[in-house]
Amino acid sequence: MVPLDKDNQDICPICLDPLKEAVSTDCRHLFCRMCLIRHMDKASVSGVLSCPVCRKPCSETVLGDNYICHTHQKRVCRFCESSRHLLCEECLQSPEHRAHTELSIENAISHYKERLNRRSRKLRKDLGDLQRLKAQEEKMLQALQVDWGSHRPRTEQQNQDQTELQQKALPRHWLDQREDPPEEVAKVFNFSEAVTQLSILVSSLERMAKELDASTLKDASDLLDRSSQQKLEGLLSHVPPANSKLS
């Protein structure tokens, strides 16, 4: 373990790497949160918690409120995948959790970060496929628009018949040619909606993977549920099956 001095104040004395999620002990020494958690796990066996640098007594509360069980006021050490709750040692003794699968905090963060990254890579590929399909539909619609323009006059009344939502989503000249939007216009509009929603979902997955810690494990689990293939079938249900090639 490296001694603390002015030249390495941004270095964790335990892992010797730049501080990640830095936390300060009661004696004001800084550590990576996960490094300090692992230290406390080992120290809890002896029942004596102390600073790894100066050996002064150290409280579990320095980890932060999100790492303390609000029921028993003890440090959380496991994440229950069934209930999606952070558990302390006393929680683990409850009959409610004995049949559940629990991961250590460190393993849970690693496990869910990998799942989030894997899901975001998959959906980003799907998003690219969807954007290409949307571009194809737009080209077809542009070709049809030229044909409509040579046969159908544009009237002021026909312009007023278009909904405000469609006017925002598509170029106005595509919607001005007839009283009811053609099937091709609806397809492009639906693709645009799907692309927007899927883009938001991919961004959320990527951001969650980067910022994941113990306090957001439940949110990560919920996000993985929302981005499952079964849920995405509902998101993309308005895209014609013949045109949708998403896996």
From Swiss-Prot:
> What are the protein's UniProt keywords?
Coiled coil, Metal-binding, Transferase, Ubl conjugation pathway, Zinc, Zinc-finger
Q: Where are the zinc fingers (B box-type)?
A: 64-105
Which GO terms label this protein's molecular function in UniProt? ubiquitin protein ligase activity; zinc ion binding
Q: From which residue to which does any coiled coil extend?
A: 111-148
EC main class here is: transferase
Instruction: Specify whether Ribonucleoprotein is a keyword of the entry.
Output: no
Short name of any one Pfam family annotated for the protein: zf-C3HC4
Zinc finger residue extent: RING-type:
12-55
Catalysed transformations (reactions): S-ubiquitinyl-[E2 ubiquitin-conjugating enzyme]-L-cysteine + [acceptor protein]-L-lysine = [E2 ubiquitin-conjugating enzyme]-L-cysteine + N(6)-ubiquitinyl-[acceptor protein]-L-lysine
Question: Which Gene Ontology biological process is one annotated for this entry?
Answer: protein neddylation
Q: Does the keyword Metal-binding apply?
A: yes
Cross-referenced Gene3D superfamilies: Classic Zinc Finger, Zinc/RING finger domain, C3HC4 (zinc finger)
Which InterPro entries would you find in this protein's record? TRIM/RBCC, Znf_B-box, Znf_C3HC4_RING-type, Znf_RING, Znf_RING/FYVE/PHD, Znf_RING_CS
Q: State which Enzyme Commission number(s) the record gives.
A: 2.3.2.27
SUPFAM superfamilies for the chain = B-box zinc-binding domain, RING/U-box
Please give the GO cellular component terms listed in this UniProt entry.
Answer: cytoplasm; IkappaB kinase complex
Q: Which residues bind Zn(2+)?
A: C69, H72, C91, H97
Q: What does this protein do?
A: E3 ubiquitin-protein ligase that plays a role in the limitation of the innate immune response. Mediates inhibition of the RLR signaling pathway by ubiquitinating RIGI and IFIH1 receptors, leading to their proteasomal degradation. Also promotes the neddylation of IKBKG/NEMO, stabilizing NFKBIA, and thereby inhibiting of NF-kappa-B nuclear translocation and activation.
The UniProt similarity line reads: Belongs to the TRIM/RBCC family.
Listed under subunit, the entry gives: Interacts with NEDD8.
The protein depicted here goes by the name E3 ubiquitin ligase TRIM40
Tell me what gene encodes this: Trim40
